[in-house]
Amino acid sequence: MPFKLLILASAACASTPLLAQAAQPNPASALAKPAFDKADAELAVRELATAVEENFVFPDAGKAYAAMLRANLAKGAYASFPDAQAFADKVTDDLQAVHKDGHLRLQVAPAEQRGQAQAPNGGPQDVNAVNKSGWLAPGVAYVDFNGFPGNQATAAAVTRFLETHKDAKALIIDARHNGGGGLAEMNQIFAQIFDKPTTLVTMDIREAVEKKHGTPFDPDDPLMRKVDGPATIIRRQHVAVPAAQQSGLRDAKVYLLTSKRTFSAAEHLSLALKRTKRATLIGEATGGGAHFGGMGPMGKGYAAFVPVGRTFDPDTGKSWEGTGVAPDVAVPADKALDEALKLAGVTATGESALTSLH
């Protein structure tokens, strides 16, 4: 079955190409739920079984998923449901019962099948994912991302923000409601806040999957450095490279706000900044989705996000799958901005500072 290759998918863009760190799942639709069709459902299950068997990040788990799906299909477990969404939810629950994965899911009618224009990593081209940005206080810059869609609108907004706030003494990045996406926006930021080339995280993908479906990375991208890895695995290190013309942000204190809704690519950002000690993470442990992959159609009217790779700390070999990235300063998510401002030497509360954002 065909996949679209992405890097990390976002909650705002639940239909993401296959190497996106997918985001937390979106509801299939706010409209009436599509009717259940037995033939369509059975075709979706057959194609999903093949997809996970051939592509899932852990081959043994992929085989176990496939065996379960085929056994359930044979005994008629997917023969009748009140609607298509109930069927998709049941299949997702069955998958998670075999092996938990924060991204793996079957869903109904993703955006790409409804004809919505997609950015290279699955986000609508005209949506600016910078929710808020500006000065919270003299010298204290703030930017709030809903996701990392990798589109032109968001890239332009990030460029403007970095230029306008290049002399900030403190930078607060709010990822508390960031469901993920791609690497583009964080690479823009990394280029300004790191003062030397720095290894961030390591990303593994099954060699057979990359050969069959391609790679979400530009082979010549200096930010995705190919390194030696285990047999059957293609390993890359994501690195930060300072921009040729850097701003004062390379010396700024950086604070990253997190919550349990911080997911996927936003967790990639979290681990990268925590591991390198380039930022202080404030808030809650993140959502726990460390596997990247992509969305592929399953039969008629269904699609599945199938994880094909994992992102992890090169120092420990451990990812944040199922556990999340722990903050440096643990506070409830709604108090994270207050704490960041306090550490930045600002006496105002987060609520009052946001009302005067400029």
Identify the residue ranges that each predicted region occupies.
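Low-complexity, Gly/Ser/Thr/Pro-rich intrinsically disordered linker/tail segments
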Residues: 318-358
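Flexible, low-complexity junctional segments that flank or bridge functional domains
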Residues: 21-226, 233-238, 253, 268, ...
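Gram-negative bacterial Sec-dependent N-terminal signal peptides
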Residues: 1-21
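Mature extracellular/periplasmic domains of secretome proteins
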Residues: 240-246, 271-272
